[in-house]
């Protein structure tokens, strides 16, 4: 029996529309990671990294340990896309500067990369004239986001979430197509492999139960999860109380950096969860725990709204 595996891939330079020629020396951070770690090949000696995702941050440290000079990490957004601990351990500990609200506006070199020009950007992401700064380098690494590979899922008719580029799933991690389950980075991009393992175990258990028993609760009422006010999405997107386990983890990401705030969940109009956080950021996945006992107290519940509230 043939099997197909889906995963995630790096965004490419073509998706960024960076002006300039296409010289050698421009790699995705994932490609550079494979070259260094598995092939024993050094892509270059003077490095600029565009994007501050976790792979890019880790490669900044890795290239430094291999003897390269990482001159700067540039991030388009006003915040880093990686974990705080990776910023500290991979950049701060090695004296590598991180320029927020900056991007590459020009590439110099025809055959081989000779340097890149960075510029500060405004709130709309447009370069600000007069802020250009040139960095000589022979290597540019792109850490500008990961894309779940869902071509097979889409071809099957699986409904996709435009925010995550992954399938929409219910509490069992089942898609809109009966018997098709999704988990891991093909569902939404994770920062910790622990969460991937938990999702995989849950999806596998639910898929096995479906094979044994079928979808016995096909017409059961579902509760819709509604992400608003700083929350970009939730996984899962719907919940059937009678089908869920005793505990359910709802994972989500925020759309900006929020300090001294609360993560709140409203059951229709009633606030049930109100958890204090010192800081939440897009680079770190958040989660709340729901229990079947909690949901059974609200038999007419239609919507669970997840939001970020100011202290």
Q: Where are each of the predicted segments found?
A:
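Flavin (primarily FAD) binding-site architecture
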Residues: 9-19, 147-156
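FAD-site-proximal beta/loop scaffold in flavoenzymes
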Residues: 27-36, 138-190
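Rossmann-like dinucleotide-binding core of oxidoreductases
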Residues: 42-99, 106, 188, 195-209
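Short, small-residue-biased leader/transition segments that mark boundaries at the very start
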Residues: 3-8
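Short, aromatic- and glycine-rich surface loops/edge beta-strands on solvent-exposed regions
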Residues: 263-265, 293-311
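Mid-to-C-terminal Rossmann-like scaffold of FAD/NAD(P)H-dependent oxidoreductases
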Residues: 194, 202, 206-275
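A Rossmann-like FAD-binding core segment of flavoenzymes
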Residues: 64-151, 246-278
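Glycine-rich dinucleotide-binding loop and its adjacent helix/turn
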Residues: 10-48, 52-57, 163-171
């Amino acid at each position: 029996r043939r099997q197909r595996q889906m995963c995630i891939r790096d965004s490419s330079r073509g998706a960024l529309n960076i002006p300039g020629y296409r010289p050698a020396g421009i790699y995705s951070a994932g490609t550079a990671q494979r070259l260094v770690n598995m092939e024993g090949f050094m892509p270059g000696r003077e490095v600029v990294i565009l994007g501050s995702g976790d792979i890019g941050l880790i490669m900044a440290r890795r290239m430094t340990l291999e003897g390269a000079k990482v001159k700067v990490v540039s991030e388009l957004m006003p915040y880093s896309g990686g974990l705080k601990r990776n910023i500290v351990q991979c950049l701060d500990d090695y004296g590598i500067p991180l320029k927020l609200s900056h991007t590459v506006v020009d590439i110099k070199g025809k055959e081989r990369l000779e340097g890149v020009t960075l510029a500060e950007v405004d709130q709309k992401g447009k370069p600000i004239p007069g802020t250009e700064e040139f960095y000589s380098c022979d290597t540019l690494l792109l850490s500008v986001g990961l894309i779940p590979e869902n071509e097979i899922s889409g071809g099957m008719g699986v409904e996709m979430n435009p925010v995550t580029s992954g399938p929409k799933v219910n509490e069992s991690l089942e898609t809109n197509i009966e018997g098709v389950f999704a988990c891991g980075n093909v569902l939404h991009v994770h920062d910790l492999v622990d969460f991937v393992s938990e999702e995989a175990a849950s999806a596998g258990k639910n898929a096995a139960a479906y094979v044994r028993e079928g979808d016995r609760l096909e017409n059961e009422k579902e509760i819709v999860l509604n992400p608003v006010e700083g929350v970009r999405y939730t996984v899962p997107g719907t919940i059937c109380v009678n089908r869920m386990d005793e505990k359910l983890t709802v994972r989500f990401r925020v759309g900006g950096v929020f300090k001294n705030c609360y993560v709140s969940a409203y059951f229709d109009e009633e606030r049930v969860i109100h958890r204090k956080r010192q800081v939440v950021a897009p680079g770190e996945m958040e989660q709340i725990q729901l229990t079947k006992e909690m949901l059974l107290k609200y038999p007419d519940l239609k919507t669970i709204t997840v939001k970020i509230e100011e202290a």
